[in-house]
Design a protein with these regions (language model features):
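A short, proline-enriched helix->beta-strand linker immediately N-terminal to the Walker B motif
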Residues: 171-175
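Short catalytic/signature loops enriched in Gly
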Residues: 3, 143-146, 239-337
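Conserved ABC ATPase "signature" region
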Residues: 74-75, 127-147, 256
Length: 337
């Protein structure tokens, strides 16, 4: 299947008060039509910057230093704002973290969704716009859409506001939907509902989705593939089954061990020791080495390449080198077989 989105060797930096932050470092991945790719990692690892780089929503202080971004085979890396405006909404759209900051509290929900419809369908009559708005509200599970159409965001619960934001994002039937931690501000029960809704919409419309999260447990129920990101780099990528049931990178082991499902009830919940490195001056070698209890000497000297485990599963750890000692994974299996 042809790739809908292909990112190759992408590096993005941001100028800050203390220096240049290397937010995204040599990242490559692809996305097929109708696929759900989850990007997981700690806060500050570059997940959101990566997505905003693709949509060209970066602040003026940020710039793409290297790499390419191709959509439907077309290289958009050097596209300017005018060209990107034609792609946003129709080719890709984004759901942000906090729905309350994405909605105008003084404008009725129906009008806000309608504005998104009109931007991409300028020839629509008022009746056509209203019909499309009601269809979108039904699609995202907003009950009694005709009545809710005339209500304000503050009259909706957090989960319902997120559904409104999803309706706006889907107004132009995008090919790719970026969901940037869409459940962070919601309670656990509502999180599950929103994730199920994302999966339902993806299956109904065939929309490819990139789901950003810091929680491996959250994405388990919806992802087809999972990319684990650390310090601006993808350190492991594979199908959801491969990453969950046969993780190979020590950082992925740490994320898995920190899930409540792995706790036995007698010991404290596992936490990864230390702090992520500064990306103003990333450490030599593997950025995770100083937090990695399984680190080898070479980890402190040289960055690991991506080792192929299967045709769909790759991990950047020297433990997969045939010369490395065989380490038993704390979450099952071994580092290399």
């Amino acid at each position: 299947m042809e790739h809908l989105l292909e990112v190759k060797n992408l590096s993005v930096s941001i100028d800050g008060p203390a220096g240049e932050v290397q937010a995204v470092r040599d990242v490559s991945f692809s996305l097929k039509k109708g696929e759900v790719l989850a990007i997981v990692g700690e806060s500050g690892c570059g997940k959101s910057v990566l997505c905003k780089s693709i949509m060209k929503l970066l602040p003026p202080s940020a710039k793409i230093k290297e790499g390419s971004i191709c959509v439907n085979g077309q290289d958009i890396t050097c596209y300017r704002e005018k060209e990107m405006q034609k792609l946003r909404g129709r080719v890709f759209s984004m759901i942000f973290q906090d729905p309350m900051t994405s909605l105008n509290p003084t404008i009725k929900i129906g009008k806000q969704i309608g504005e998104a419809v009109v931007i991409h369908n300028k020839n629509y009559t008022k009746e056509q716009v209203n019909k499309k708005v009601l269809e979108l509200m039904e699609l995202v599970g907003i009950s009694h859409p005709k009545e809710r159409y005339h209500q304000y965001p503050w009259q909706f619960s957090g989960g319902m506001r997120q559904r409104c934001v999803m309706a706006i994002a889907l107004a132009a039937d995008p090919d790719i939907l970026f969901a940037d931690e869409p459940t962070t501000a919601l309670d656990v029960t509502i999180q599950a509902q929103i994730l199920d809704l994302l999966r339902e919409i993806q299956m109904k419309l065939g929309t490819a989705t990139i789901l950003v999260s810091h929680d491996l447990g959250v994405v388990a129920r919806v992802a087809d593939r999972v990319a684990v990101m650390y310090a601006g780099k993808i350190v492991e990528i594979g199908t959801a089954e491969e990453v969950y049931y046969n993780p190979r990178h020590p950082y992925t082991w740490g994320l898995m061990r920190s899930l409540p499902a792995f706790a036995n009830g007698k010991e404290s919940l596992y936490t990864i020791p230390g702090m992520p490195p500064t990306l103003i001056d990333p450490p030599k070698g593997d950025a995770f080495a100083c937090r990695n209890e399984y680190a080898l000497n070479i980890d402190y000297e040289e960055m690991s390449p991506m080792f192929k485990i299967t045709d769909t599963h790759y991990a950047a750890t020297w433990l997969l080198d045939p010369r490395a000692p065989q380490i038993k994974s704390p979450v099952g299996g071994t580092a290399h077989e």
